């Protein structure tokens, strides 16, 4: 699980500020516009005194003539300032969220494979989408409310003190009480917001599992299981939402009750003779109206607190990910094309957060241009050995050498450029077939080279039958293709990459016998003059390997070529008899 540090609102906002500060000019314009907007409201209230005392009290017609023009002017200014403030704040928040998402996306993409082993895809998707939107809410809507309503409160206080400081000073007494109440509510909002974000991750994960495993759900009749699971996480989300509503609903009347008590006391104080002598109808109306008008910004600030705390809680969660260490790339050695000699020396390896060793004392040597095959039962450690060559994981002890140099001496990008991988779990992108074959290197290959690789992988047979050929968009993870077709695209990708080291991890597992024979010829051609590590369950595909290693429980228990291993009548011979029914 992702654990975020319990930071205060101020500490969290201070970390967010460097992402906002590049756009502070937009914030400044928005703040000025919001202050003008709030000043317009205050001036509107101040017009009540001349209207009542002069316009109606003394029947001064001139006041009634210029008053409408002032009102229209103030409304125009108020409307224009409202538009400017909303536009500027939305622009700033959009930029902040875009940059936050880019930074988060880039950071997650640079995390080690072990990170993805421990995190669900749904949770990470929720972080990039839902949590980022919560940041937008805190940096846009909340900011508008805080500045506008804050300016309104200041303006109204100035107006009240200007006309009657005696009555207005009473409101100073309630300020600490309101502050304490809001602080208590803030802690509750923060706690609920964190729970809501975690629950949203569970909702996304549950949905993602159903969508990805839809065929299995139908085949095994798991609709009730998935429905029940989704109902549980959805109900938890609803419960957290109701807790947020309850906290907000309780805080609103409490703060308004405090304010109304102060208002009642002001009315009582206004009846004192010493105070009444200084008041006119216009003055008491302005002061009283200002106090009533204070209710709206006070309520808005109370409500925005929940929104702001959601945003700050989301920030904490995102910062927790950004604080995680990315994949270490301490190597300095760059290499354009390796010879391809690989060697494992006394290698021991355990997966992160696991105590038991997955590989124990592994020793193997693959000379340049030779093919070594790994066989054994599922879970014996064959794929783990392959994953160490690309440094998806780092070993606990021992050495893995490429051309006589420790893998850790190479820059990761340079090392991985030397390896072409075809696994049983093929991932294709929602793009054209051509772009999938030339993935991430489209500009390096011509159309003819892409087509040649597809022909060598025996993929052009089905590609030519498609309406747009190589330009056919194949959908998410190649949903429009069969398992065998997807694997042929992956083989074409490896052929085009033309790396000196080739890893085939059950590369033909999804193919029928006829297609396997055809592709095996292409793979045999591909393996020429390359160092190849082949992992296979079908022993018929690795009989020609220069050396075969039998892996069991993380150890290499037998080694030799096909003929020699059959002659020893050991574990390999037993596997061979099981497959061929001898």
Curated annotation (Swiss-Prot):
The enzyme's main class, written as a single word, is translocase
Q: Where are the transmembrane segments?
A: 16-36, 63-83, 153-173, 253-273, 275-295
Query: Does the UniProt entry include the keyword Cell inner membrane?
Result: yes
Q: Which GO terms describe its cellular component?
A: plasma membrane
What EC numbers are recorded for this enzyme?
7.5.2.6
Domain of life of the organism encoding this protein: Bacteria
The listed locations are: Cell inner membrane
Q: Which residues form the ABC transmembrane type-1 domain?
A: 28-310
ABC transporter domain residues:
342-578
| Catalysed transformations (reactions) | ATP + H2O + lipid A-core oligosaccharideSide 1 = ADP + phosphate + lipid A-core oligosaccharideSide 2
Q: Which family does it belong to?
A: Belongs to the ABC transporter superfamily. Lipid exporter (TC 3.A.1.106) family.
Q: What does this protein do?
A: Involved in lipopolysaccharide (LPS) biosynthesis. Translocates lipid A-core from the inner to the outer leaflet of the inner membrane. Transmembrane domains (TMD) form a pore in the inner membrane and the ATP-binding domain (NBD) is responsible for energy generation.
Q: Report what the protein is called.
A: ATP-dependent lipid A-core flippase
């Amino acid at each position: 699980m992702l654990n975020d540090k319990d930071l205060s609102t101020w500490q969290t906002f201070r970390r967010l500020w460097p992402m906002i500060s590049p756009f502070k000019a937009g914030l400044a314009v928005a703040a000025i516009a919001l202050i003008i907007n709030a000043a317009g409201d205050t001036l509107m209230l101040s017009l009540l005194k001349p209207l009542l005392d002069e316009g109606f009290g003394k029947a001064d017609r001139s006041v009634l003539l210029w008053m409408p023009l002032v009102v229209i002017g103030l409304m125009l200014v108020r409307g224009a300032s409202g538009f400017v403030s909303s536009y500027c704040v939305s622009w700033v928040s959009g930029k902040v969220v875009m940059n936050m998402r880019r930074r988060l996306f880039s950071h997650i993409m640079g995390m080690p494979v072990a990170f993805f082993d421990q995190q669900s895809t749904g949770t990470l998707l929720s972080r990039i989408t839902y949590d980022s939107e919560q940041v937008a809410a805190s940096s846009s809507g909340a900011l508008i409310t805080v500045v506008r309503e804050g300016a309104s409160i200041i303006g109204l206080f100035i107006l009240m003190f200007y006309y009657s400081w005696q009555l207005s000073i009473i409101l100073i007494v309630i300020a600490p009480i309101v502050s304490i109440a809001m602080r208590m509510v803030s802690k509750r909002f923060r706690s609920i917001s964190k729970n809501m974000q975690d629950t949203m991750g569970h909702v996304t994960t549950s949905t993602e599992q159903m969508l990805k495993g839809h065929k299995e759900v139908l085949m095994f009749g798991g609709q009730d299981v998935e429905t029940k699971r989704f109902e549980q996480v959805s109900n938890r989300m609803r419960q957290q939402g109701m807790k947020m509503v309850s906290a907000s609903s309780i805080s609103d009347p409490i703060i308004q009750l405090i304010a109304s008590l102060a208002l009642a006391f002001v009315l009582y104080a206004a009846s004192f003779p010493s105070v009444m002598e200084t008041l006119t109808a216009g003055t008491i109306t302005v002061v009283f109206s200002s106090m009533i008008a204070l209710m709206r910004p006070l309520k808005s600030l109370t409500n925005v607190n929940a929104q702001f705390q959601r945003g700050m809680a989301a920030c904490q969660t995102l910062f927790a990910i950004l604080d995680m260490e990315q994949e270490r790339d301490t190597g300095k050695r760059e290499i354009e094309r390796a010879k391809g000699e690989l060697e494992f020396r006394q290698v021991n390896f355990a997966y992160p957060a696991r105590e038991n060793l997955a590989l124990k004392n592994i020793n193997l040597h693959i000379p340049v241009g030779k093919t070594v095959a790994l066989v054994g039962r599922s879970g014996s450690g064959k794929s783990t050995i392959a994953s160490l060559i690309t440094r998806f994981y780092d070993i606990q002890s021992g050495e893995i050498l490429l051309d006589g140099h420790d893998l850790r001496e190479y820059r990761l990008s340079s090392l991985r450029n030397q390896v072409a991988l075809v696994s049983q779990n093929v991932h294709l992108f929602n793009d054209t077939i051509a772009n999938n074959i030339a993935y991430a290197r489209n500009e390096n290959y011509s159309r003819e080279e892409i087509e040649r690789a597809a022909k060598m992988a025996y993929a052009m047979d089905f590609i030519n039958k498609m309406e747009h050929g190589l330009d056919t968009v194949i959908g998410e993870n190649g949903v429009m293709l069969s398992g065998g077709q997807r694997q042929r695209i992956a083989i074409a990708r490896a052929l085009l990459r033309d790396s000196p080291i080739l890893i085939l991890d059950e590369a033909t597992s999804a193919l029928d016998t006829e297609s396997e024979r055809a592709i095996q010829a292409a793979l045999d051609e591909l393996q020429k003059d390359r160092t190849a590590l082949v992992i296979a369950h079908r022993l018929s595909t690795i009989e020609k390997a220069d050396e075969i290693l039998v892996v069991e429980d993380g150890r290499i228990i037998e080694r030799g070529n096909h003929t020699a291993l059959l002659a020893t009548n050991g574990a390999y011979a037993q596997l061979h008899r099981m497959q061929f029914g001898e």
